[in-house]
Amino acid sequence: MGLFDQILSAIDDPNQQANPNQLGNILGAVEQLSGNQGVNTGTTQLAMSVLGGYVRSALQNVRSQSGDAQAQQIVNQFSGTNPNPQAVQSLFGAGQLTQIVNDIAQRTGLNNATVRAMIPVLVPLVLNLLKTGSNAQNPAQGSNPVLNTFLDADGDGDVDITDTISMASRFLNQRS
C-alpha cells in the first residue's frame, strides 16, 4: 500500500490523527511557501519529494539506532506547518544539509539560497504528513502505519511525496 493509501486509511480510522483539515493545512502551507519564494507549486512539491528521501534516510537511521519510538518522537515533536530550523537540525548535520541543498537545487533548478530558505518549512511539512498515522489519543503510543510505510519503502530513492500531495489535493477537491 502506498503512502497516500495509508493516509486515506488513517483518515477513515478515528484512532489515527489524519483528517481532511490536516491535509488541507499541509497543502495550504506548500502553496504559501511557493508564493513566498516565487516558485511554482510543482517545483516546491519536487523539492519536498527530494527532501523526503533524505528525511526517510535520517528517520531510518534514528529507528535502527534508537527504535521506533524515537523516530515517532521526532515526527511528533517537529511536525507542523510553520518554519522550524530545529526540525532540520534534529535530522541533519551542517555538512549533510549542504549536500541536500545542492541536490535539491540541481534537481529542481532553484538556486541554493531559495532551497536553503525552503528547507525549514518543508521538513516540518514532510513530518506532518507522516504524523497523520499517529494514534489520535496518544501520539507517542502505538504503531504509525503511515510512518512505517514511509520508512519501509523499497529504497529506490523515489519518495512518493509529490504523488501524495497531488492525490491529497484531488481528494480534498472532491470533498468540497
What are these regions (language model features)?
Residues 1-176:
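A structural "flexibility-hinge" signal
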